[in-house]
Curated annotation (Swiss-Prot):
InterPro entries: Ribosomal_uL29 (IPR001854), Ribosomal_uL29_CS (IPR018254), Ribosomal_uL29_euk (IPR045059), Ribosomal_uL29_sf (IPR036049). It holds the Pfam family Ribosomal_L29. One of its GO terms (cellular component) is cytosolic large ribosomal subunit. This is Large ribosomal subunit protein uL29.
């Protein structure tokens, strides 16, 4: 098999990708047998290409799977940990905009009764 491009793989369905993955794994095992039995140099150099192709297929499968999960959980209240934004531990625990703006009943009353003073500037 020739070198596989990731952009060609993205259009394929999951079943096709899994079938291609199986084919590549079979080919890799055949190449490894050829290596042990003393195969041609062209077959030995092909091992690397097939390994990288397997990695590309697996990468595309995992990326599409994660993309579909993101679509599924979009707008839901709870998301799996690996779909949430990473950030730092401190940033994840920080109050959000809504929580920062909240005031107690007592503070709301104080703000209402003693509003900010406005001063006129003498020209």
């Amino acid at each position: 098999m020739a070198k596989i491009k990731a952009r060609d793989l993205r259009g394929k369905k999951k079943e096709e990708l899994l079938k291609q993955l199986d084919d590549l794994k079979v080919e890799l095992s055949q190449l490894r047998v050829a290596k042990v039995t003393g195969g041609a140099a062209s077959k030995l150099s092909k091992i690397r290409v097939v390994r990288k192709s397997i990695a590309r297929v697996l990468t595309v499968i995992n990326q599409t799977q994660k993309e579909n999960l993101r679509k599924f959980y979009k707008g839901k209240k709870y998301k799996p940990l690996d779909l949430r934004p990473k950030k730092t531990r401190a940033l994840r625990r920080r109050l959000n905009k809504h929580e920062e703006g909240l005031r107690t009943k007592k503070q709301q009353r104080k703000d209402r009764l003693f509003s900010a003073r406005k001063f006129a500037v003498k020209a």
